[in-house]
From Swiss-Prot:
HAMAP family reported for this sequence: Ferrochelatase
Keyword terms: Cytoplasm, Heme biosynthesis, Iron, Lyase, Metal-binding, Porphyrin biosynthesis
GO terms (BP aspect): heme biosynthetic process
Gene3D superfamilies tied to this protein: 3.40.50.1400
Keyword NADP: no
Name the UniProt record assigns to this protein: Ferrochelatase
One Gene Ontology term of the molecular function aspect: ferrochelatase activity
Compartment(s): Cytoplasm
Binding site for Fe cation: 196, 277
Organism, as annotated: Synechococcus sp. (strain JA-2-3B'a(2-13))
Length: 344
């Protein structure tokens, strides 16, 4: 019997203080995220850097309640998406898997196999594609499918990026307008789109489309916002000494303060769920930086989380790939090892 399922992918995050160091190890052990000239050093590097950064990272998580809310929020997104699909006649399970913390992709795909899924629609919760996020997860799925003949019989439909999905764009624009309208002088607010950064070499040497898609995404959203405010795109969360995509968010904040900007609205453009980068880096670090720079009114657009319009957009992304209710599945011949169907 044919059976569709949906798999939501995200980064993952530590839920307790004890989780922090092993989570960081998993993160830095991924060669798609941190590229070393000598791959055999990856694990030693991951152990060293996770050990060195663990204490500071624990303090950051303590500042937002002790751990990441990402798993809880992603589970809520999955429940709402499943309910939306059921209401449309698609009675399909929606699974959640994380790249670097529990529930890990490796364990969730075993559950998918046990549940008898024959077609799996994979939707990374990263609107813009990067080899370090969506690409890393797809590469892991390719390896798991190649190693397990039973998994290889499950058809995989993978959605690469969806920064231009209409309901996502509309939901972001609406959230920005709502926040702008709360300022004393809405027309004088500078809007700062802050995206998670990646090393510049990923774009210039590896051909990563992330920067191009991010810039296009901001243009689409801003057109929907329909306001005359000045706006800027910047990149946050830089790690290490290598050059990352610029301008850096912290430098833009300082520059805006020096130019006399007094009202600033930050839009976390690459984050669809609240987590450490929004709750601690933006809400605490960047807020303090802005106030020191003379920006009196600093606000942030909330992440979309389980916003109904956003969930409707996710449903629109996966719906074309689900088996039509009441109809038998079309014949499927497993693809060559490591291949997958990629959709835009």
């Amino acid at each position: 019997m044919s059976k569709s399922g949906v798999l939501l992918l995200n980064l993952g995050g530590p839920e307790t203080q004890a989780d922090v160091q092993p989570f960081l190890y998993n993160l830095f052990a991924d060669p798609e995220l941190i590229r070393l000239p000598f791959p055999f050093l990856q694990r030693a590097f991951a152990w060293a850097i996770s050990t060195l950064r663990a204490e500071k990272s624990r303090r950051n998580y303590a500042a937002i309640g002790g751990g990441s809310p990402l798993r809880r929020i992603t589970a809520e997104q999955a429940r709402e998406l499943q309910a939306h699909l059921v209401a449309e006649g698609y009675d399909v399970p929606v699974y959640v898997a994380m790249r670097y913390w529990h529930p890990l992709i490796e364990s969730v795909v075993q559950q998918i196999k046990s549940d008898g899924i024959t077609r799996l629609v994979v939707l990374p919760l990263y609107p813009q594609y990067s080899i370090s996020t969506t690409g890393s997860s797809f590469k892991l799925l390719d390896r798991l499918w190649a190693e397990d003949p039973e998994l290889a019989c499950i058809e995989r439909r993978q959605i690469c990026s969806w920064y231009d999905q209409p309901q996502y764009v509309q939901a972001m624009a609406r959230a920005i307008r709502e926040q702008l309208d709360g300022f004393a002088e809405p027309e004088g607010v500078h809007v700062l789109f802050s995206a998670h950064g990646i090393p510049e070499s990923y774009v210039t040497e590896a051909g990563d489309p992330y920067q191009r898609e991010m810039e296009a995404c901001v243009r689409l959203i801003w057109k929907q916002v329909g306001r005359p405010n000045d706006h800027t795109l910047s990149y946050q969360s830089r790690v290490g000494s290598v050059r990352w995509l610029q301008p850096y968010t912290e430098r833009v904040i300082l520059e805006l303060g020096s130019r006399g900007v007094k009202q600033l609205l930050v839009v976390p453009i690459s984050f669809v769920s609240e987590h450490i980068e929004t709750l601690q880096e933006i809400d605490i670090e960047y807020r303090e930086l802005a106030h020191r720079a003379g920006i009196a009114d600093f606000r942030r657009v909330p992440a979309l989380n389980a916003d109904p319009l956003f969930i409707a957009g996710l449903a629109a992304l996966v719906r074309p790939h689900l088996l039509t209710p009441g109809l038998a599945a079309p014949a499927f011949v497993p693809a060559a090892v490591g291949s997958s169907l990629l959709e835009r």
